[in-house]
Amino acid sequence: VEAILDVALELVVEQGAEALAMREVARRAGVQISSVYQYFPSKAAIIRELATRNLERVHLILEREVGDLFAEHDGRPTPAQAVNRVVDAYYAHYRDQPAAVAVWAGAQSDHGLRELDIEDSRRTAEFLVPSLMEILSLTDTQDVFALALLLAETTGAVARLALAVEAPLRDQLVAKLKVMLIATLEASQANGRAA
């Protein structure tokens, strides 16, 4: 299974998810086509597994970064510290892992896989809610969930957009994302509710 996924990932990076061919995966992995179909009944199933693995890596990075953030700031990071830490980690993952961007692009082209991305944004938001409630001193879980979902989806979209454009604009997009997110969190904190 791992050999099949490794080859599939190489092909997605080289040619894009749309061009992924099961026969080529089998050929490069050195297995019979029936072996590929035994584990993955379709190209979408391969992309789904690659996307799921990437999303799990991102979630582990996020857990580590949020834990470190709270530890380094005695449990009381500012909105700016939180945004800078999380955006930098998220962006670095996609910048340093071009395969992750290729898999994400492939997942976006399939409606069923887009649902996986939305589910992951919800999972990320659920993870962020307690931290945001602590950072912002807010108590309305549903309100903070909506804010966290917006932050998760916006961060992902802008990070991937930044990687698709040239370097000067790339840095500007990430910087402006941070300004926007910090302003949103600080406004929520000042209002006593998610803005």
Model-inferred region functions:
Residues 122-129, 141-162, 172-184:
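Hydrophobic alpha-helical segments that form the core
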Residues 4-12, 54, 58, 90, ...:
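Short hydrophobic clusters on alpha-helical segments that form packing/core surfaces
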